[in-house]
Amino acid sequence: MNEQQRLASQQANSSTKKEEKDYSKYFESVYQPPSLKDAKKRGKEEVKIERDFGLPEEFRNFGTGRKFYIRTYGCQMNEHDTEVMAGIFTTLGYEPTFSTEDADVVLLNTCAIRENAENKVFGELGHLKSLKRRNPDLLIGVCGCMSQEESVVNKIMQKNQHVDMVFGTHNIHRLPYILKDAMFSKETVVEVWSKEGDVIENLPKVRRGDIKAWVNIMYGCDKFCTYCIVPYTRGKERSRRPEDIIQEIRHLAANGYKEITLLGQNVNAYGKDFEDVEYGLGDLMDELRKVDIARIRFTTSHPRDFDDHLIEVLGKGGNLVEHIHLPVQSGSTDMLKIMARKYSREHYLELVRKIKEAIPDAVLTTDIIVGFPNETDEQFEETMSLYREVGFDTAFTFIYSPREGTPAAKMKDNVPMEVKKERLQRLNTLVNTLAIEKNSRYKGQIVEVLVDGESKNNPEVLAGYTRTNKLVNFVASKSLIGQLVKVKVTEAKTWSLNGELVEEPIEVK
């Protein structure tokens, strides 16, 4: 139902609702659906930086006595967005809850990268429908990347009318106003901005832990790979100022955090949008080496923008870890061209050579898509051979999932699903084989582990990660949680290592 249809419906029903408040004044401001056409546009306007986030007096104690629940799907960027929304809720006076049954507001922070992720969200909306019947005052919201898609918003409006609000990735800072509109409106509040995006600083955050932290360094993507919806849902590439990033990380270090992950849809493009200074990811990492914090890592990289200066800086080590996630997607130059990745197999292998030369202990992981439209057996074999040649430690592997609105979704696909599944199975067998081979090399070695907490499988066992992002399980006192320790590896598994504590916590210098 579009805006005009809703207004007409309201007028038609006005005779039966004379005693109710007239909500039509809200519709002009709260029905702003997404447009993939607008989201694709890239202009030359300067990125707007907002630094004055604050709550007007009208929102003071707005959420007192109420509870919120956020379910997060997808990538680390979504996890960080959830931390920001939790911060806004808390500032409003809301309290968190871990149960939808106990919540006054339920938000689903969604992922649009694959069809399976969207199916999970609509499945959850189905479960929430009965909860809404039992608790009509419950506010249900859908936010994140799915909200930026026209087809998703249309489906919500048509088949999920128990949803009270829909907002996107560009206007999280407007959550207080969206909540207020949803409370008063009798229709679904839709406020999705299909724009290039701004940078909003000084937003409150409730971080998930006190050991590791996400820090956004940039937003958006301008690469427009033919299979990917992200440039449409996250806007253009726009970088935070380095002084803001460094200040945030120094503050986290002062508060005891041990590890920072720098976030961006394409972190290697950091600084390319600056007009007043030549400053890239390598320059930022070089400055962050001087910050008194144990570990700094970043994700996600694009091979096209991974330059020599960054490699040189990473080779200096220190608090810059030796793990690099470098999505290749395919080992075939022809496939990479159709994907619009803008690099060849040879370019990727040369980049890997440079990284390994500068960082001999570098651990590389990757993302791979199989079954892309018209992928041949020979092209798939090129992916298998590249995987062996690089010697990745592990990979995230996927069957291609068409995303409406992307160029690849319109491509003719002559690869049968059974062939795609067989290729994925073969690739995963190779991934598993190399993973256990790589992990077996750690047996007998002493590694540095940042202790995250109890093992998910055994509360008597502690779990943490090495600098190269290897999961290590070992028995020790829970007082070591949050500390850096030395562990001797005694057993190697496909996805983890087991070990024994060999000394007390490491002093971070």
UniProtKB/Swiss-Prot annotation:
Ranges of compositional bias, category Basic and acidic residues: 16-25
Q: Give UniProt keywords alphabetically.
A: 4Fe-4S, Cytoplasm, Iron, Iron-sulfur, Metal-binding, S-adenosyl-L-methionine, Transferase, tRNA processing
SUPFAM superfamilies from the UniProt entry: Radical SAM enzymes
The positions making up the signal sequence are: none
Keyword Nucleotide-binding among record annotations? no
Domain of life per record: Bacteria
**Alphabetized InterPro entries for the sequence:** Elp3/MiaA/NifB-like_rSAM, Methylthiotransferase, Methylthiotransferase_CS, Methylthiotransferase_N, Methylthiotransferase_N_sf, MiaB_methiolase, rSAM, rSAM_horseshoe
Say what the protein does.
Catalyzes the methylthiolation of N6-(dimethylallyl)adenosine (i(6)A), leading to the formation of 2-methylthio-N6-(dimethylallyl)adenosine (ms(2)i(6)A) at position 37 in tRNAs that read codons beginning with uridine.
Q: To which protein family does this belong?
A: Belongs to the methylthiotransferase family. MiaB subfamily.
Please identify the protein, giving its name as recorded.
tRNA-2-methylthio-N(6)-dimethylallyladenosine synthase
Species source reads Bacillus cereus (strain G9842)
